[in-house]
Regions:
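Histidine-dependent nucleotide/RNA phosphoesterase domain, centered on the 2H-phosphoesterase fold
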Residues: 1-184
């Protein structure tokens, strides 16, 4: 990071406890099929709207009111789990994810977060937004496993969170810098 006060940050939608519990059960069910994968703790899973990376204190302060306004303009929504997948789509998998079907309001919120990031001095994100929850990552090359159907149900998305991410040997630790209720 460029300065000691910088933080690694991202913007995400939080999940409800019911879906987190269902994700934990799904992970336990699929783990035997997924050799070499490191599964994320369910309490750390979220719907990332914009990864920021190194973020200065000034950028944090610029983003707070912009994210508050973006959250206020988006109503709470329901999202439906739509199955398991892997990135990349071909070859040796690196990431196991759970796809979400989300309403257009989530895409509008993601675009608002992108505009806020640009206004705070971040480069434009080149990768297209895909509504998904990262469940785990493979450490090494692995054969593509057959994935079972997954339908842990729906979740209510009602909170936008500006997170700090601290990387640790046992996994990342996410700390909210700010929370904003959708539609509030």
């Amino acid at each position: 990071m460029s300065a000691a006060a910088d933080v690694r940050a991202f913007i995400a939608l939080d999940l409800d406890a019911r879906l987190r519990e269902a994700i934990g059960e799904l992970q336990a069910r699929v783990r035997p099929r997924l050799g070499g994968i490191r599964l994320l703790r369910p309490e750390g899973i979220h719907l990332t709207l914009r990864f920021l990376g190194d973020t200065s204190p000034a950028q944090v302060e610029t983003l707070r009111p912009l994210l508050a306004a973006a959250a206020a303009a988006c109503p709470p929504v329901e999202a439906r789990v739509a199955g398991l997948g892997m990135f990349p789509e071909r070859g040796s998998p690196r990431v196991l994810w759970l796809r979400l079907d989300v309403p257009p309001a989530v895409y509008e919120l993601q675009r608002a977060c992108e505009r806020a990031a640009r206004e705070a001095g971040f480069e434009r994100e080149e990768r297209p937004f895909r509504a998904h929850l990262t469940l785990g990552r493979w450490r090494d090359r692995a054969p593509r496993p057959d994935l079972p159907p997954a339908d842990p149900g729906t979740t209510r998305l009602d909170t936008l969170v500006f997170f700090r991410s601290d990387l640790r040997p046992d996994g990342a630790v996410y700390t909210p810098l700010a929370r904003f209720g959708l539609g509030a």
